[in-house]
């Protein structure tokens, strides 16, 4: 088990603040946050590349805070993969084993085994410059795993890949983990990677680890408005709660639980259903709305709605936009279930 206890670090204009969490053996732990949150600095401290100003890193109960990287039993895959350009793929993968003075026959056996699992055995004679981004990523992961580390650290491993390759390698990473059973800390800004790969997640914002928990629990129940906004709860509404009803001006919103006094709620845009007529639905919150803006957001369309002078944002598909004849100024109905609401 890896334990990070109260790690702090001032780095240029950045401050990592009292970071604590643990990773169990066999766990895939995601550190999720925006660019500049301090994710890479945290990984480099765990890897031993830079020292912390305070706090400890323990591996299986042993304090490794001041140990050099090569004595930690930890493998680190940086974002740029850091492959040796003058070496073949075989020699890149074998590098850590050679440093550890593993016998040549054992090196060859382990390199062939890991390259078979990762699907790169046919590339062993090649140089890194002749490889695609996805192939380089596989080589970097193979080089890390072949030394059989206690834990592997992955810094935005899919960030430099195009969408199709990234999606394929995420699925392959699941398979590699099943077959090899490794423990990992994976830092990313991608919700897709977090949801697809993680057992637990730590949300990192402005140098602080602000929430840690099971992936689905954190995504559905953020512990603060700050976390909710980062996780896509674009609709944050403040009002006065009286039992299971929130009063927001003329609006009455049914809540999923009893509350009293001034509270805030969060609703994801994808949880709001749009229709041009009032429809039969189990949703207890159905409101007439006016479309104020229409914005393309990749495969979806975001609608900005005015509901009794309250702004709501909702997603619909392009085909639904056309089929419903929705345009700016049109009146529609917006509905959402009480269970889709998160109360802060």
UniProtKB/Swiss-Prot annotation:
Compartments where located: Cell membrane
Principal place of residence: membrane
Annotated InterPro entries: AAA+_ATPase, ABC_SmlMolc_Importer, ABC_transporter-like_ATP-bd, ABC_transporter-like_CS, Mo/tungstate-bd_C_term_dom, Molybdate/tungstate_ABC-ATPase, Mop_domain, P-loop_NTPase
Keywords associated with the record: ATP-binding, Cell membrane, Membrane, Molybdenum, Nucleotide-binding, Translocase, Transport
Entry-linked SUPFAM superfamilies: MOP-like, P-loop containing nucleoside triphosphate hydrolases
Gene3D superfamilies associated with the record: 2.40.50.100, P-loop containing nucleotide triphosphate hydrolases
GO MF: ABC-type tungstate transporter activity; ATP binding; ATP hydrolysis activity
Catalytic reaction annotation: tungstate(in) + ATP + H2O = tungstate(out) + ADP + phosphate + H(+)
Cellular component GO terms, alphabetical: plasma membrane
Amino-acid positions noted as binding ATP in the UniProt annotation, renumbered to this chain: 33-40
Subunit composition and interactions: The complex is composed of two ATP-binding proteins (WtpC), two transmembrane proteins (WtpB) and a solute-binding protein (WtpA).
PANTHER family in UniProt: SPERMIDINE/PUTRESCINE IMPORT ATP-BINDING PROTEIN POTA, SPERMIDINE_PUTRESCINE IMPORT ATP-BINDING PROTEIN POTA
Protein's name according to its UniProt entry: Molybdate/tungstate import ATP-binding protein WtpC
Species this protein is from: Pyrococcus furiosus (strain ATCC 43587 / DSM 3638 / JCM 8422 / Vc1)
Gene: wtpC
